[in-house]
Amino acid sequence: MTIAALPYIPKTITVHLGPPSQWAENMTVPFPDYIKNVASSEIYPTWEPSALRANILAITSFVLNRVFTEFYPSQGYDFQITSTTAYDQKFIPNRNIFENISLLVDELFDDYIRRQGFIEPLSAQFCNGTTSICDGLSQWGSQELAQQGYSSMDILRRYYGSDIELVTDAPIRDVTRSYPGYPLRLGSAGEEVFWLQAGLDRIARNYPAIPIVPTTGVFDQATEEAVRTFQRIFNLTPDGMIGT
């Protein structure tokens, strides 16, 4: 099996309609439709165009980070993201989509932001800025900045830092997974282990407690310890194995 070494836009995305550890329906939708749904659920169509663009780029970057790092599949789940804001972004099945938001997403769905010097899409956290406050983008704050004349990238740099850059026209392809469908454990070897190690190293940038391991393709003791640390962080059984 293979996995893209660079970020890509998935043709479709599978959304778990509830918290990750609870049973709920999985819904697979075209990726642009997912972004349109989340944007229509999270922000207001009457906002300034630059605020809408900034929020759409943040929404897209966040979910692409989930896809690229295999955040949920690496924990054994069969979906890319959930529908709940306690973990991810608000997704409401079969909701109405605002026309101007739909048109903007058609233009922007294959663009995302990242940090300079990094390949992965930015895990662009955001909150409404009124009833909830976070370290990322303030949705209402972005509207205020847009009303002051800020461009979409100026708004994003205000919240995420001056070292972010815009990637445009990313390739579109089917979702691929590095986990082969059978357990990877101490002694395993092959391309699947190589991509497991690469994925762990990407995740370790946001969770520095996870030790960096060489991408050798051999599931050695250092890899096992990195897996155990990952499992402890995400409240999984720390058995040092991927898959059961």
Task: Give the ranges of each region predicted by the language model.
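Conserved, single-site charged/polar hotspot
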Residues: 1-244
